[in-house]
Amino acid sequence: MKRLKYRVTKDHQASFAYAMISAEGDEVSVGREDQEMPGWFWCRDSKGVEMWVPSSYIDIEGSRGKFNQNYNSMELNAKVGDFVQFLGEALGWVECLNHEWRYGWIPKDKLTKIQKNASQIPDPLS
């Protein structure tokens, strides 16, 4: 099975050292929407963890939201030249794994899709 891979074109340092990990059905308090990245909302879970959540992951009613799928907000630190395995995408960010099986999100504008010879890039899922 061919899997989509990306190469890191700009270094990325995670903005947060922690993550919000939520399961489908979990509820959150929904705060402000990010003005620079529309569709991302500042949310607080039942444990008090606050983090940005893409609107595609939560059903929002007023100031409350419910996850419509599992979500892990962990960002992935990456250096130029690293390769990552695509897992998903939401509002300008790519969910991925690196060659060390580290999981996280990287802004899509810091990545370029591998078009040729992607099969020669190590695949953390194989």
What kind of feature is each model-predicted range?
Residues 1-126:
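Src homology 3 (SH3)-mediated interaction modules
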